[in-house]
């Protein structure tokens, strides 16, 4: 392997690990629980008063993040950034689906393809492949795990696409990417898009701004096809959550994406802080 390529691989791995660590601490549920535990621990020391305040504040903020509409309020701008794709534009040359919807831990153990809550990233491909029979189908996704790193998402996608009845010769699989940045760069290397070709990018609506920004930075212009909406729209700005877990999951998802946008812009992986159409 050339020295330059080796250096890029090492740098990419370091960024991947650092991003996972930052991602963990970007989630309010993790941060607030950690603060709460610190507060509880301090109550057994001479800083008991400060500990009670820290624990109490963390508990209140957990309630706000979990039960209030806060999660909807911060995910909505992400979801609304790119409008639904306009079919009047005509048939695309190809369709790209990003990983993140396939469970690489459960699937090999259970012997079937297990999907998570982002399943629309995959099911949309079945409909698009039928609607545009001449379009190439590309899936980009290796394994984004540090632990429990098993099969690649691409291998599971191949099985799922076969069950959809998509001809094997239409499909191209990118199985090395571990994050959104690598999705963009590795997919361009695989596809080698020609001038004037139009490609659809299928991913969760809240993930679309960062994904489009990465593909643009890689020199691969794409048309957004957002799926997997978590809100109904502005009406959900007033809708609280019935369970703490659901609200925290929404808040975590949105915060992880906002932090991702900021980090990607800071390190030059996108050219815009909040990419738009």
PLM features: what roles do these ranges have?
Residues 3, 7-8:
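A cross-taxon signal for low-complexity, glycine/charged-rich
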Residues 11-41:
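Membrane-embedded alpha-helical segments of integral membrane proteins
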Residues 32-56:
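Cytosolic-side transmembrane helix boundary signature
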Residues 40-43, 62, 66, 264:
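Structural signal for membrane-spanning alpha-helices in multi-pass inner-membrane proteins
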């Amino acid at each position: 392997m050339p020295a330059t390529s080796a250096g890029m691989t090492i740098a990419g791995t370091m960024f991947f690990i650092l991003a996972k660590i930052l991602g963990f601490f970007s989630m309010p549920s993790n941060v607030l629980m950690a603060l709460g535990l610190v507060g509880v621990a301090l109550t057994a020391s001479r800083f008991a008063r400060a500990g009670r305040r820290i624990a109490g504040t963390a508990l209140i903020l957990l309630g706000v993040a979990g039960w209030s509409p806060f999660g909807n309020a911060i995910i909505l701008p992400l979801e609304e950034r790119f409008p639904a794709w306009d079919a009047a534009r005509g048939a695309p040359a190809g369709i790209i689906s990003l990983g993140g919807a396939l469970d690489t831990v459960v699937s090999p153990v259970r012997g079937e393809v297990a999907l998570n809550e982002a399943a629309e990233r995959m099911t949309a491909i079945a409909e698009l492949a039928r609607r545009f029979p001449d379009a190439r189908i590309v899936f980009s996704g290796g394994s984004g795990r540090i632990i429990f790193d098993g099969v690649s998402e691409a291998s599971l996608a191949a099985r799922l696409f076969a069950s959809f009845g998509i001809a094997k010769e239409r499909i191209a699989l990118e199985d090395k990417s571990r994050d959104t940045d690598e999705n963009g760069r590795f997919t361009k290397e695989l596809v080698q898009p020609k001038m004037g070709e139009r490609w659809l990018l299928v991913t969760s609506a809240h993930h679309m701004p960062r994904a489009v920004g990465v593909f643009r930075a890689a020199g691969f212009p794409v048309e957004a096809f957002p799926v997997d909406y978590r809100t109904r729209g502005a009406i959900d700005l007033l809708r609280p959550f019935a369970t703490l877990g659901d609200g925290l999951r929404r808040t975590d998802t949105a915060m992880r994406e906002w932090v991702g946008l900021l980090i990607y812009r800071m390190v030059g992986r996108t050219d815009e802080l909040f990419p738009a159409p």
